[in-house]
């Protein structure tokens, strides 16, 4: 297991984390660190604890022992007000979107603003419309309901909602799952732009090797309850660890892909 040392630029620090459900051990002695303004991927087989670790980082579940610090705050020390304040500083895009079917897109994106701010309805709608433009959807999409959107559009809409509060930190759960190759490539580009233009720190769970090769600065491979290795995809592809090699087997992964160049910073992405 690779253990990282403390860094002043760390946005997330996890130390000696252990989690169990009854007799089933999910994590034991997990250590990892996510650096500011990097795209960090969590990989591993089914049951390796990726989703549980994500839930612990976003305060949906508590580990049995160990520490998690997010944006400089020890998650064990939070009261209700501090929890609410910290949650305002990150956004989450869940695997299945989590859009409310009874609300149109503009209303869905505006929900975090209604929950966490005292802004008036007109300003909330204006911000939501800007987020729609930001993630590359047409303005009239705001009046549509989730059932009227394609899978790729729903992913973008979920991402727009995660960005509603202008977070410093973004969590993505399987952002390309269920998408066709063209839509998945669009998500790749979008993730890069969010980091490069806005300086977001991005943590993602993914099984998509193409996404990891294209956008991840570093990847942590989980297995047997712990972190098997952390490094760039190039570094991981050269390791002999069987728990890591499984991600580089098969026809699709036999030839390592070169990291795709960062997309050009289009003027529409420049902060106003």
Predicted regions and their residues:
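The feature captures the beta-strand-to-loop junction immediately N-terminal to the Walker
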Residues: 43-45
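Helix-to-loop junction immediately C-terminal to a conserved catalytic motif
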Residues: 58
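Conserved ABC ATPase "signature" region
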Residues: 74, 121-140
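Conserved ABC ATPase signature
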Residues: 145-149, 153
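Conserved catalytic motifs of ABC-family nucleotide-binding domains
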Residues: 166
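Catalytic Walker B motif of ABC-type/P-loop ATPase nucleotide-binding domains
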Residues: 170-173
């Amino acid at each position: 297991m690779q253990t990282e040392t403390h860094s002043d630029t760390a946005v997330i620090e996890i130390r000696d984390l252990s989690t169990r459900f009854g007799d089933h051990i999910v994590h034991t002695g997990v250590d990892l660190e996510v650096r500011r303004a990097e795209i960090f991927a969590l990989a591993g087989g089914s049951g390796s604890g990726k989703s549980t670790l994500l839930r612990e980082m976003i305060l949906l579940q508590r580990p049995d022992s160990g520490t998690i610090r997010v944006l400089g705050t020890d998650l064990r020390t939070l009261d209700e007000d501090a929890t609410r304040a910290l949650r305002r500083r990150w956004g989450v895009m869940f695997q299945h979107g989590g859009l409310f079917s009874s609300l149109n897109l503009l209303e869905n994106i505006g929900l975090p603003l209604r929950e966490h701010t005292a802004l008036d309805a007109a300003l909330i709608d204006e911000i939501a419309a800007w987020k729609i433009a930001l993630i590359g959807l047409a303005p009239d999409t705001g009046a549509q309901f989730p059932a009227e959107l394609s899978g790729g559009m729903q992913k973008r809409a979920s991402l727009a909602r995660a960005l509603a509060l202008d977070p410093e930190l973004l969590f993505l759960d399987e952002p390309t799952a269920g998408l066709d190759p063209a839509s998945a490539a669009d998500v790749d580009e979008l993730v890069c732009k969010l980091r490069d233009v806005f300086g977001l720190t991005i943590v993602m769970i993914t099984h998509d090797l193409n996404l990891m090769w294209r956008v991840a600065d570093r990847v942590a491979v989980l297995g047997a309850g712990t972190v098997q290795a952390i490094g760039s995809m190039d570094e991981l592809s050269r390791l002999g660890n069987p728990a890591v090699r499984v991600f580089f087997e098969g026809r699709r992964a036999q030839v390592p892909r070169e990291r795709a160049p960062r997309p050009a910073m289009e003027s529409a992405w420049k902060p106003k």
